[in-house]
Amino acid sequence: MDVQICRGVKVKKYRGIIPGDKEKNQMTSKHYKYFQPNDKDKKDDQSDCVIRALCKVMNKSWLEVFDELLPFARELQCMPNSKPCYETFLLNHGFVYQEISNKKGIKLPTVDSFTKDHKDGVYVLRLAHHIIASVDCYYYDTWDSGDCCVYGYWKK
């Protein structure tokens, strides 16, 4: 079990089946699909959400995306999974960013509701401390982040 920030609150992030909790085990969204392109990360604990999301939207392997991020990271002198690096990468690959207003009184969409409303297309969703891919009515991650708020997205 890990802790994840969701809607500004720390929540417990369970991996796989929750022992003794049949209700939670059956609560996975129908729009969620498990996605782990990193063959070396058997426990889903590498904190490589940026690379995983880019693998899905670019239809490339984990190593291909990692290698393509390195020149941007070197140029910007930052880590490959840092915001300046992946933003530059996405812009260079034709993605356009759309901020979602989080003004007082405006409810942010959840990953699940965003995916339902954006049935067609390729998106990279920005959550609190997390990035995921949304492609043609499904969101892809190593855990079901459907209840987390979307703060912005890149669309191809």
Which positions does each model-derived feature cover?
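Conserved active-site-adjacent core of cysteine acyl-enzyme catalytic domains
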Residues: A73-H129, V135-D144
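Active-site nucleophile-adjacent alpha helix/oxyanion-hole segment immediately C-terminal to the catalytic cysteine
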Residues: K12-M79, P84, T88, N92-H93
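Noncatalytic regulatory segments and standalone regulatory/sensor domains
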Residues: D141-K156
